[in-house]
Amino acid sequence: MSGVPLRVFRAAWVLPVAAPPLRDGAVLVGADGRIAAVGPRLSIEPPEGAEVVELGEAALIPGLVNVHAHPELALFRGGLEDLRFRDWILRLVGAKRAALTDADYDVAARWAMVESLRAGITTLAATEMSGASAGALREAGMRGIVFRETFGPDPAQAEDSVAELRTAVEALRRGESELVRVGISPHAPYTVSDRLFAAAAEYALAEGLPVAVHAAESAAEDHLVIRGDGDFAPGLRARGIQTPARGRSTVEMLDRLGVLRTRPLLIHCVRLDADDVLRLADAGAAVAHCPVANARLGHGVAPFPELREAGVRVGLGTDSVGSNNRTDLLEEARVASILHRAGRRSPDYLPAEELLRLCTLDGARALGLEDRIGSLEPGKDADLCAVSLAAPHARPVHDPLAALFHAARGTDVVLAAVRGRILYRDGRVLTLDAAALGEAVDAAAARLGGHLR
């Protein structure tokens, strides 16, 4: 990468993750987009010709890492409220088929990038069928992985589904770059047959593709996988698809089918037992923890403490705005802290410094990117986020970490940068036309609305 000016970012607080917080700190970014130095403001003299970016009463942190989102579903915010999970999915799928075009997905994905940048998210793992996020990430200048979904609950569909997946992935990979990668996502146990899971895993291993799977998310999924009944079973049987009682959990099933050999990112993982947790740890799998969406859909709370204690890589995800309504990783971290403190009956579980790690370096580890991003260290890419702590709801600041996660909001973000390139500053996304996108979103949503009831 070239063309990025030398920059010194200065802020009232610099929170490197890999080192203690710095009062009146600075980060020097080289022309290669990498961090050259981190230290007290007075110790970093701007090189000749360097641009100095003064951030004032802000906390400068690594760019936030959202390990699970559905950007193509940005038009569904507020349109799928108070539904049972099966009905939520059926209404979502029906509306997509009836109302949305490829152009709508392009608009939705770009709108999701606008929201993400405004919330300080610089890296995003997108799980979707359209693949629209690949172009949206590139245009926005963000970093990410696009997990292209595949579906097929009928075993007879497996070969055709894999062939279609290969074609789509090959097209997406032609646009890969240092910042944007492509993976695959056999969607979930209620939409993917055993045969398709196994074939997708073999394909991923052969091609070196990262894998993401929605897994152990709901009681309905549990009932289908273990007992062969529950909310999903009647619809599958009506299509002539058998729903055998496996007598094993989703994690056991994925292990038996070879999916865990891919060291996948498993999304949600609410319904795990102790054996499942150990199995994930042994396999080197990662988990996308989505506390807000899991709670709003009534699924419950993932066993995050047990996963961490077992050594499983866990990052935070916002899921779609159809299930969460907001793409705010600071809020996601705060909710995670509240839920798990309540569950553990412990007022000091997940302190603010661990929340910072959870939505930066831990997220990078979950996506296999920890050698490049997730902390402010010389040699790493300068993916940055600055959060103002000057608003009344954040002051006074006795502890910048506590202020960041227990008082500040995603709307307090004042800067987002990737490899030193500023993508968002003081209310304005610099790489996308937010005003035009907003008008396009409203027009598409008006057409979609009639299909959501």
Write out the residue ranges for each language-model feature.
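Divalent metal-coordination and catalytic microenvironments
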Residues: 12, 27, 33, 57, ...
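Alpha-helical scaffold segments that flank or form the walls of functional sites
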Residues: 59, 77-141, 163-177, 440-451
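Active-site microenvironment of metallo-dependent hydrolases
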Residues: 1-25, 30-36, 357-453
